[in-house]
Amino acid sequence: MNENVMVKGLTALTILTSLGFAENISNQPHSIAKAEKNVKEITDATKEPYNSVVAFVGGTGVVVGKNTIVTNKHIAKSNDIFKNRVSAHHSSKGKGGGNYDVKDIVEYPGKEDLAIVHVHETSTEGLNFNKNVSYTKFADGAKVKDRISVIGYPKGAQTKYKMFESTGTINHISGTFMEFDAYAQPGNSGSPVLNSKHELIGILYAGSGKDESEKNFGVYFTPQLKEFIQNNIEK
């Protein structure tokens, strides 16, 4: 991959405190720059597939099973995540699913930017994680020119952790690497890449630049990667 690839979300945009996740966000108005017509805000994330998407500080993740979230290694390892919380499908108007402390992290042993994050089942508000999220199903596969959507928290702190969905097309797949043109920004790292049936193809991990017209890259979930994830879902 080009050395100029920009990893999205390496720098945390806010620091969480013990008071919770969303409460620490600035009330000043913000907006996402250069957002095109294929980007929309999800104001109510209580329904599938949006209620499977979670916010980390500086990144995004997707729920795949009991207390189990998939994201990037660089998100899981950043900012001492054990001091932070995961916010389940936080959105600007809909009811969020709670804020959950991280229990442990399992990194994929290969080069792929993939990690499993397990959270404690009970939120700081007393909510049950598994009763407030949905589990995203894996796609059987994908091919070039398939339509996709990317759901996550671009510029999380600057947008007060509003959820956005962008759509695009797969341009290239090779092994565990995929390239697509759905719009993304810092904060979208770990965002689920879904097919038209809202099945999980992979997760976003990087982009080639700051302009929305440039390419974005994801970890494509091969059978081997799906097996790793499934073997690490809490029983």
Curated annotation (Swiss-Prot):
GO terms for molecular function: serine-type endopeptidase activity. It is an enzyme of class 3 (hydrolase). Transmembrane segments: none annotated. Pfam families: Trypsin. It is found in: Secreted. InterPro entries: Peptidase_S1_PA (IPR009003), Peptidase_S1_PA_chymotrypsin (IPR043504), Peptidase_S1B (IPR008256), Peptidase_S1B_tx (IPR008353), Trypsin_dom (IPR001254), V8_his_AS (IPR028301). The active site is at residues 74, 113, 189. Its main location: secreted. Residues 1-35 form the signal peptide. It comes from the Bacteria. Its EC number is 3.4.21.-. GO terms for cellular component: extracellular region. PROSITE patterns: V8_HIS. One of its GO terms (biological process) is proteolysis. The keyword Hydrolase applies. Keywords: Hydrolase, Protease, Secreted, Serine protease, Signal. Belongs to the peptidase S1B family. This is Serine protease SplA. It comes from Staphylococcus aureus (strain MSSA476).
